[in-house]
Every structure is written in structure tokens, then in C-alpha cells.
């Protein structure tokens, strides 16, 4: 049910144990890629779960963008605990990777690299491009999406009408902060939108049905250095 997903979001993003050393000074950023030494091909639109050792519920769930990049920025974590990053395809855990705990506090504050190599068995989603016309220019983004797609909007979450698992929403290939979702969907007119990529998983998982990647007529998209030598997380499953 949809209320279960919304409750899951609240629990995973807001829960911090008073007995832990969790904070948001550190977070995992990474790229899912298919080459063992250099980033030559990112793996797009993977559902990625972050779990902490000893916890039954995942800490957070996200999706890689079209370049294979993902981030758990803002998720409270304890760097002195092991974490696991898992790839979910349909109803199965397709792969898991170990993020080793720190023994001593690092000298830096910020992101911790969590790149991993993953080769999908096959394409797990379909992709459609929506390009607005002149007649759509004055429509608000949310109204346009409701016109083109069978979806509903509840508590800052977009759901396909036929599913209880929502869409992950990107703007210019970057995650949208929760506090900006309402503003972007309900105040931005379609004349500011170049196109929308609609990704639908062939087999929706319990976290997401797919992705909406909104491309504005302005602004830059994030890039990934294709020459960067990558540290890869060890695969444990």
C-alpha cells in the first residue's frame, strides 16, 4: 500500500538512534559502472539500497541517474559501522557490495566513494521521451504529467495509478531535494521544460516503478569524468 511506502521513507530518512554516532557529515557517493578500471559505461536507473550492519530496515533507497551516478547525501550514517550497498532488480537482490567501516575518524568531512562494478543481465526497463508542444507551454509540470501519464501525487511522491511503488524524480539528471518537489511540480510551467524521459521498470520493485528525468531548457547536468580511475567496492553477493 502507498501509505507503507511513505511510512518507510519517514522511518529511513528521519530515524537516528540516540545510541549511535550517526550524523550527516559523511555520505556515500558513487557510480555504477561496467568497466573494471575506467568509467567507460555507467549503468543507468538502478534501484540501489543502503543498509547498515545490524539493522533490519534499509537506511535509504535511491536510483542511479542516466550516467550511473548515485548519492546518499543527507542520510545519517555511522562511519564506524559496516554498510552494504545492494542493487535491486524486480523482486530480487541482484548484487551486494561491502562498504567497510572506518577504524579512525578521517581527516576530511564529506563524501565517501562507493563506486561499484555491475553488469546487468539485460535491459530491465523501457524508455519514452515526452516533448512538450506549444499548446502545453502554459500547463504546470504536474498537470502535464497527469495529462500524459496515469499518475497521482501524494505527499511529495508521484505514483503510477496502477502501482503502489512511486517514480524516482530527477531534474537535469540530478536528485530533487524533498523540500523542492512541490515547487518544481506545481509551480514550473512547461515552457521551461525541454523534455521528460519516462523510465518504466519491466518488473517494478517494492521501492520504485521507474524514473522521471526532467530536462529543463536551462541549467547544466552533472557529468562524470570518464578518465577517472575508480576504486571499486568489493562484491559480496
What are these regions (language model features)?
Residues 65-76, 183-184:
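Short, surface-exposed beta-strand/beta-hairpin micro-motifs centered on an aromatic residue
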Residues 155-199, 225-236:
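Periplasmic plug
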Residues 135-174, 204-215:
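Extracytoplasmic beta-strand/coil segments of soluble accessory domains associated
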Amino acid at each position: 500500500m502507498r501509505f507503507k511506502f511513505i511510512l518507510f521513507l519517514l522511518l529511513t530518512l528521519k530515524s537516528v538512534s540516540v545510541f549511535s554516532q550517526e550524523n550527516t557529515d559523511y555520505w556515500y557517493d558513487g557510480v555504477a559502472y561496467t568497466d573494471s578500471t575506467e568509467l567507460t559505461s555507467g549503468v543507468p536507473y538502478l534501484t540501489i539500497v543502503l543498509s547498515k550492519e545490524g539493522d533490519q530496515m534499509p537506511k535509504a533507497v535511491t536510483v542511479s541517474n542516466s550516467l550511473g551516478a548515485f548519492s546518499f547525501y543527507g542520510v545519517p550514517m555511522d562511519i564506524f559501522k559496516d554498510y552494504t550497498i545492494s542493487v535491486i532488480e524486480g523482486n530480487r537482490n541482484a548484487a551486494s557490495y561491502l562498504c567497510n567501516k572506518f577504524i579512525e575518524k578521517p581527516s576530511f568531512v564529506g563524501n565517501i566513494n562507493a563506486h561499484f562494478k555491475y553488469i546487468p543481465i539485460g535491459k530491465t526497463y523501457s524508455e519514452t521521451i515526452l516533448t512538450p508542444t506549444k499548446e502545453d507551454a502554459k500547463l504546470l509540470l504536474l498537470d502535464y504529467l497527469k495529462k500524459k501519464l496515469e499518475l497521482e501525487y501524494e505527499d511529495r511522491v508521484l505514483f503510477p495509478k496502477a502501482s503502489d511503488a512511486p517514480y524516482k524524480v530527477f531534474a537535469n539528471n540530478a536528485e530533487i531535494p524533498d523540500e523542492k518537489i512541490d515547487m518544481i511540480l506545481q509551480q514550473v510551467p512547461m515552457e521551461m521544460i525541454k523534455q521528460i524521459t519516462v523510465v518504466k521498470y519491466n518488473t517494478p520493485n517494492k521501492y520504485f516503478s521507474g524514473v522521471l528525468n526532467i530536462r529543463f531548457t536551462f541549467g547544466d547536468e552533472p557529468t562524470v569524468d570518464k578518465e577517472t580511475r575508480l576504486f571499486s567496492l568489493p562484491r559480496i553477493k
